[in-house]
């Protein structure tokens, strides 16, 4: 299967970053001693060279800084991309005006951040912080086929949430899961003409898993043309060699 790889330019990285943020990131509003509000965009991934280099590309294209953390459980070290300066956050979130967030959770986080940036009121924040997912604002309806940046977005999202599984039985598979986002998984299912049913693996955690070879080949074609940029690309490279 020969497909020419796309050049990863700044705009492609922005689109990829939106998907990556939706899968493994967070849009945060916090407080310091109930006196001042603090704002933060963050993506945490396993600490490895591939993820570090991906974050360097994101840093160059978008901004932010990178640091390394040891998890509290000491299960693994993490590499973290962070933006925590208010003016830089205000600049970066304008990217979402062009490449909108697709998951309801991140849309709610962004709306809460914007409201607090405007209000700058610690008391309001303390009162409303537990309600940011309860008070639902009207989210735009969309069809993936109408989203011009979806291909790069999906690669970013899969970098965070996708899994390429190689089995000795030769029943290899690709899966992706997300909490609450059944509608989004349904759109991905439709985009690739997947016939497999979406399963609820745990409470409010939905799973889409694909075994069918013709669909897996279609997915492989996608990730060659719109490449994964971090550690997930290693598992993809091993996976595609079986087809």
UniProtKB/Swiss-Prot annotation:
Q: Where in the cell is it found?
A: Mitochondrion
UniProt keywords, alphabetically: Endonuclease, Hydrolase, Intron homing, Mitochondrion, Nuclease
A GO cellular component annotated for this chain's UniProt record is: mitochondrion
Citing just one GO molecular function, the answer is: endonuclease activity
What Pfam families is this protein classified in?
Answer: LAGLIDADG_1
- UniProt xrefs under InterPro entries: Homing_endonucl, LAGLIDADG_dom, LAGLIDADG_Endonuclease
**Enzyme Commission identifier(s):** 3.1.-.-
Q: Which domain of life is it from?
A: Eukaryota
Broadest EC class? hydrolase
- Would the keyword Hydrolase be found if you checked this record's keyword annotation? yes
Give the residue range of the signal peptide.
none
Please name the GO terms of the biological process aspect recorded for this protein, alphabetically: intron homing
Q: What does this protein do?
A: Mitochondrial DNA endonuclease involved in intron homing.
Family indicated by similarity:
Belongs to the LAGLIDADG endonuclease family.
Q: Which PANTHER family does the record associate with it?
A: INTRON-ENCODED ENDONUCLEASE AI3-RELATED
Kindly provide the name given to this protein in its UniProt entry: Probable intron-encoded endonuclease aI3
**Originating species:** Dictyostelium citrinum (Slime mold)
């Amino acid at each position: 299967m020969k497909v020419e790889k796309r050049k990863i330019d700044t705009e492609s990285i922005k689109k990829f970053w939106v998907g990556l943020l939706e899968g493994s990131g967070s849009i945060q509003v916090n407080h310091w001693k109930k006196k001042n509000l603090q704002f933060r965009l963050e993506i945490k991934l396993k600490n490895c060279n591939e993820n570090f280099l991906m974050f360097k590309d994101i840093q160059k294209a978008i901004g932010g800084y990178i640091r390394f953390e040891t998890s509290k459980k000491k299960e693994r070290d993490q590499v973290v991309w962070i933006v925590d300066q208010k003016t830089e956050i205000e600049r970066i979130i304008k990217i979402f005006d062009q490449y909108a967030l697709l998951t309801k959770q991140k849309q709610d986080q962004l709306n809460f951040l914007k409201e607090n940036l405007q209000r700058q009121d610690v008391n309001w924040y303390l009162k409303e912080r537990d309600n940011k997912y309860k008070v639902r604002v009207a989210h735009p309806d969309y069809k993936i086929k109408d989203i011009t940046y979806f291909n790069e977005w999906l690669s970013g999202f899969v970098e965070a949430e996708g899994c390429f599984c190689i089995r000795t039985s030769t029943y290899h598979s690709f899966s992706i899961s997300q909490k609450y986002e059944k509608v989004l998984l349904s759109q991905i299912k439709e985009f690739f003409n997947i016939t497999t049913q979406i399963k609820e693996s745990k409470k409010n955690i939905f799973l889409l898993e694909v075994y069918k070879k013709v669909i897996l080949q279609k997915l492989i074609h996608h990730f060659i043309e719109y490449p994964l940029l971090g550690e997930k690309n290693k598992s993809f490279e091993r996976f595609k060699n079986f087809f």
